[in-house]
Amino acid sequence: EPTEIEMRVASNVAALIPDGATIQLGVGGLPVAVCRALKGHKELGVHSGVISDVVADLIEQGVVTNARKGIDAGRTVTGGLFGSRRLMDFADGNDAVEMRSSEYTHNQQVLARVQNLYAINSGVEVDLTGHVNSEVAGGRERDTFSVA
């Protein structure tokens, strides 16, 4: 579950994402919190390496329609499902969810064709040159997976 601080940050991030945007989601509490904060948005798209239950919620609520993505119209494109049995059942046989390899979901030429793409990820630290570390803290790998 996202923390109270993550929910406040998520509210600010969601305010920066316009209706009709396509989102890419990382893993962890912050991307989950941002998805929850997006429930008032309209006609969002999803093109992401992985999705969790909150994306299924947004599709069911009509927030994610994938109508304005520029490519893969009408379909949430993802390389993996990370969530509950409900998510697996939701995606199984669902034409609105398209499973693709990372060669597609992370391909620069494909990503360049996605309209109005916003990447939502969390990080552990950022250095002075702008490089983001999202996996290691204090010499130890962080558990970055959070399912909601």
Feature-to-residue mapping (PLM):
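Conserved alpha/beta enzyme-core scaffold
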Residues: E1-A148
